[in-house]
Amino acid sequence: QGSMEPSEFNITRWLKPGENQIALEVYRYSDGSYLEDQDFWRFGGVHRSIHLVHTPDIRIRDYVVRTLPAVQGNYQDFRLLIDPQFSVYQGMDGKGYTLQAVLKDADGREVVNMVGNVEDILDLEHKAARMNEWYPQRGPRKMGRMSAVIKSPQRWTAETPYLYKLELRLQNVNGQTIEQVEQPVGFRCIEIKDGQMLVNGNSVRFRGVNRHEHDPYTARVMSEERMLQDILLMKQANVNAVRTSHYPNVSRWYELCDSLGLYVMDEADIEEHGLRGTLASTSDWHAAFLDRAVRMAERDKNHPSVVMWSMGNESGYGPNFAAISAWLHDFDPTRPVHYEGAQGVNGEPDPKTVDVISRFYTRVKQEYLNPGIPEGEDKERAENARWERLLEIAERTNDNRPVMTSEYAHCMGNA
């Protein structure tokens, strides 16, 4: 389940020599639909690409790429960390296989070249009694099986989206490359200090928009031309950030944000809306909540444009969101976590599971009424803060998290 998250299936055992037919059965609604109650038009069918992939018996299953300052607090030199993962079939053990990691700049010049031993990375002979430095008996698992310090790299920002290219080459015992994957790399560091969002040590103000995947002619199917048009409009309006409201977008969107420069708040496909916080507080739904966030983060973890995870939208708050926050922070300590529903009410502080204070539906002008408030009533919904209330929150001294308006100038009906 999860119509906006990636899915992958191993169909090897069902294939036969010659021509094969693959059939898809798509359900428009399921019990998972209770977590997809976003305010948008609902369509049936397949609206994203499907790929059939053939791989060797040892393959690069996944990899994590991170960039961190080589010295904490100094943004001159960066450390490149690569954590590869492999899948093996047919009894292979990886003996004699190597993984070559080559980083090139935008002009194709080689910056660094590293080689790792696949057998050591797989560590198939690991026994419980044997120490494993990457998955220790106590403490978190380590990152960076392959790492190098890059001297004075070009830094990635939304204004200067400089990208390097990382080539990962899996080579067999004869030195032949049997698989190669390429990953754009942007050297950047995201931090929160003293109530400010920092990119490479510099304070940044996000001037962002919410964006649905919606085309007047192709509905949910987003062409590259339409995505480029959206980014151009944002750039012309001095927009530097976008929230993937309210689900992970098609993969090509993140690639364009990497190369053209937009800060992305990547949002999980979770919105129970009319049920308020019922499901967020129900343990039966714990796995469904976590599954959607995990699949989002696993897919988008290597994009430099993704600077923040968002746990969802308008689903109340409860232990299921606390679980998502714990997983995201442990899986990826390099990005802050957002969720507009994690709000304190009646003077209570916002939960510590989020790294930013989020409010929405703020008035564009003071005289404008908030949504849902009858004219003439002097009443303020807790989640619809006035601008002066946001300023008050930002200036308080007992909570130094940045304040963000996750939605404003709300206009139902456009998507």
Language-model features, listed with the residues they occupy:
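N-terminal carbohydrate-binding accessory modules
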Residues: 63-66, 167-234, 336
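Short beta-strand edge segments in extracellular beta-sheet folds
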Residues: 53, 119, 184-188
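Substrate-binding/catalytic cleft of secreted carbohydrate-active enzymes
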Residues: 231-232, 241-415
